């Protein structure tokens, strides 16, 4: 038996081994999860990479993302092959399909809190709901460490530890890397002309620091909510990032930009930026957010 807790929202889960009896004294508010966990409804896309690393794709029967929304080849192929079915997005799940699949657990992200009635309805149907928060971690290694959480759920603790240890070993040389003195901005431009940037405590900001650069918006704080990003007026973004040595465009929000000219066409102010003039502009692939186990 293992009791798992997600402190941010007070959720607790009692993992009961296969064949074991459920204790009679389980406190109210503790969700019982009986192993083996099967026929999962996976809504949180950042979790899929962890399941792939644990060789647990076959535990997932339902997806909250259509095949074309997956940038992980194995996940997309599983949907195209019919091994995983689309069961509706977080705000509009197909309850009938989920019940028919004998779903053992719904793994959501915090978007579900925008439609709490959906979470309540799933639970009324007897489907436990886990709201994962790996994307709120302040560093990439902490985000990867959630693999231990899922290793416990799936009865693959030893494998999860091995996978995590390998990743930690890969990252170790970066932790002692000296600063290059260079600065970097990570952003996207929204349709309503705002710059979406990561807050200073976000894992992406930490990745930039690990690579030896200074994140130009490191001083942006929580601002009263738990979101890892915030929108800035273009003039504020201009003031903070114009002199950055490198720009990294986040394609996972507004789509891929293939050339610097395309980027400047989205936001003409960028033509004045040092990184644009020096040819130091990059764009992350749309798979970036889903590749939780990569660095």
Residue ranges and their predicted role:
Residues 34, 41, 89-93, 109-116, ...:
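Soluble non-cytosolic domains of exported or imported proteins
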Residues 40, 46-49, 66-69, 93, ...:
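Solvent-exposed loop/turn segments at secondary-structure junctions
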Residues 204-226, 248-251, 283:
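His/Asp/Glu-enriched short active-site or ligand-binding loop at hydrolase and phosphoryl-transfer sites
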Residues 92-103, 231-243:
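Short helices/loops that flank or line small-molecule/ion binding pockets
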Residues 137-162, 243-295:
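Structured C-terminal subdomain patch of bacterial secreted/periplasmic proteins
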Residues 5-99, 105-112:
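A short, structured surface patch at a secondary-structure boundary
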Residues 38, 57-59, 102-104, 125-130, ...:
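Loop/turn elements at helix/coil->beta-strand transitions in domains of secreted/extracellular proteins
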Residues 41-45, 49-52, 159-212:
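Basic- and aromatic-lined ligand-binding clefts that recognize polyanionic substrates
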């Amino acid at each position: 038996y293992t009791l798992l807790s997600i402190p941010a929202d007070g959720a607790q889960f009692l993992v009961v081994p296969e064949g074991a009896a459920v204790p009679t004294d389980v406190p109210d508010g503790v969700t019982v999860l009986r192993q083996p966990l099967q026929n999962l409804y996976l809504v949180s896309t950042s979790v899929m990479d962890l399941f792939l690393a644990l060789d647990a794709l076959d535990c997932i029967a339902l997806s909250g993302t259509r095949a074309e929304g997956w940038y992980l080849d194995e996940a997309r192929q599983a949907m195209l092959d019919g091994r995983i079915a689309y069961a509706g997005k977080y705000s509009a799940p197909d309850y009938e399909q989920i019940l028919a699949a004998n779903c053992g657990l719904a793994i959501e992200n915090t978007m579900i809190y925008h439609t709490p009635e959906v979470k309540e309805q799933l639970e009324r149907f007897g489907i436990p709901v886990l709201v994962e928060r790996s994307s709120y971690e302040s560093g990439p290694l902490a985000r990867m460490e959630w693999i231990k959480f899922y290793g416990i759920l799936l009865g693959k603790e030893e494998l999860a530890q091995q996978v995590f240890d390998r990743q930690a070993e890969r990252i170790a040389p970066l932790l002692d890397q000296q600063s290059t003195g260079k600065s970097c901005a990570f952003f996207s431009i929204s349709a309503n002309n705002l710059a979406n940037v990561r807050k200073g405590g976000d894992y992406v900001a930490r990745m930039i620091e690990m690579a030896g650069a200074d994140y130009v918006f490191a001083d942006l704080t929580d601002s009263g909510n738990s979101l890892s990003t915030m929108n800035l007026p273009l003039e504020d973004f201009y003031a903070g990032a114009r002199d950055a040595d490198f720009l990294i465009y986040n394609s996972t929000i507004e789509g891929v930009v293939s050339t610097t000219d395309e980027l400047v066409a989205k936001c003409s102010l960028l033509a004045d930026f040092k990184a644009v003039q020096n040819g130091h502009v990059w764009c992350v692939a749309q798979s970036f957010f889903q590749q939780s186990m990569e660095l």
